[in-house]
Amino acid sequence: MTSKIKCALIGSGNIGTDLLYKLMRSDVLEPVWMVGIDPESDGLARAKAAGLKVTADGINGLLPFVEADEIKIAFDATSAYVHAENSRKLNELGVVMIDLTPAAIGPFCVPPVNLSQLDENVKNINMVTCGGQATIPMVAAVSRVQAVEYGEIVATVSSRSVGPGTRQNIDEFTRTTAGAVEQIGGAEKGKAIIVINPAEPPLLMRDTIHCLTKEQPDEQAITASVHEMIEQVQQYVPGYTLKNGPVFDGRKVTIFLEVEGLGDYLPKYAGNLDIMTAAAARTAEMLASKMLNPEPHYNVTQEAALA
């Protein structure tokens, strides 16, 4: 049996708990700790039942055990407000931090766009936001064909899928996503909007992407690029679907997406959780494979090889 890299999950809410199930299926990652602040949280209860060590004392409850339990990677699914301190404390112990908050201390990672370009020595990687993971691949699909003057994304998510941490970070969500639309998506100017939909029954995550190209768009090349990128995202988020588009109106290119989750923790309508946690797991698998096989040529998964 192949050895695995041991991991800790910080945050026992929706994102942390959904991520737990994905890590439990990994060939190269082994979740051994879950950290929370509410001893009654469902996430901690599920983690304990799955055999993980748990603490409700926050990050300080984990620190004394990091070295003994050989934790090499930690996932922070708490809040942008506390991430900097969490990252500092764990980085000092040699742990690489995968940041699922909008804190954006480390470089952005959107797997099909820039996973292969990440610095292998980086100690903090930011997964942007759920809206960013869903939409930035589409902005990048357009910008790799021709220059994008302006990119705007609208992410609509079910209210039931949005926990208190995300609600506290709405401003950070929009700023971080807009920044990544520019830095990773390739738009000269980016804007992000999140809509929390209270509809019952809950709707699937839906995303609209608008790109304004500098020149008249090459419709055939952009359409081919978008379909190619859709296939790359589907390799780790099977429910990532192009519902309409690309639609061309002058220099404006519009793409409509729907994201259905795997239903690991919350039901399938929570595609926003799925795309975030799947992207984080995929990024960590790349890091873990490098740790386990430090050769120049590593093999993470078939999906990563095709990305």
Curated annotation (Swiss-Prot):
Oxidoreductase recorded as keyword: yes
Keywords, sorted A to Z: Aromatic hydrocarbons catabolism, NAD, Oxidoreductase
Keyword NAD: yes
Top EC class, one word: oxidoreductase
Catalyzed reactions per annotation: acetaldehyde + NAD(+) + CoA = acetyl-CoA + NADH + H(+)
Active site: 130
Record-linked InterPro entries: Acetaldehyde_dehydrogenase (IPR003361), Acetylaldehyde_DH_C (IPR015426), NAD(P)-bd_dom_sf (IPR036291), Semialdehyde_DH_NAD-bd (IPR000534)
Coiled-coil portions: none
Pfam family, one: AcetDehyd-dimer
GO biological process annotation, one example: catabolic process
EC number assigned by the record: 1.2.1.10
SUPFAM superfamilies: Glyceraldehyde-3-phosphate dehydrogenase-like, C-terminal domain, NAD(P)-binding Rossmann-fold domains
Binding, NAD(+): 12-15, 161-169, 272
Molecular function per GO: acetaldehyde dehydrogenase (acetylating) activity; NAD binding
Family, similarity comment: Belongs to the acetaldehyde dehydrogenase family.
Protein name listed in UniProt: Acetaldehyde dehydrogenase
Biological source species: Shewanella halifaxensis (strain HAW-EB4)
